[in-house]
Amino acid sequence: MSDVKDILIEHPIDIPEMNVKGFIDVVAIMESGEIFIYDIKTMGSWSWRFKFGRGKGNPSIHQELQLGTYGYAIREEFGRCDGLSLICYNKDTSDMHEVGVDLDFIDQSYNFWTRVQDLQKNGMPMLQDGECPVMDWECKYCNYKELCDARG
């Protein structure tokens, strides 16, 4: 592994064609030119056991799609993205675990956001649970929450 040239923290992204803005936790730019993205996820012991324990729960791809979206933005900005990783931190024990995410999620996230944009062309669509937003708690951050609440 080559040496780190630069580290970007809370790096802003803006993808107008996807109507997506956000911040990447960590972007590591290596002397070799390689670029790696890290998204830090904090979780309690129950979530940690669910994700890493013996009886691992069903995987959810929303975190992978989020990283893929970040990868798309970095690839557009810098011309490349060489690695995606979740850094999971157990806030109860301070344990950490790195989970690599396949670079195919860059294209999957692009396809996901393209589909959302296509659905939105005729106004705000009635999206199914698990599409967009993927998780119910994400609604509180959405600019259109009141419209969804009003439609039932």
Residue ranges and their predicted role:
Residues 1-56, 78-82:
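Catalytic cores of nuclease domains that cleave nucleic-acid phosphodiester backbones
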Residues 54-64:
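A short acidic, glycine-rich active-site loop
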Residues 60, 69, 73-152:
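Metal-dependent nuclease catalytic regions and adjoining charged, substrate-binding loops involved
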Residues 18-19, 62-66:
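Short, glycine/acidic-rich beta->alpha junctions
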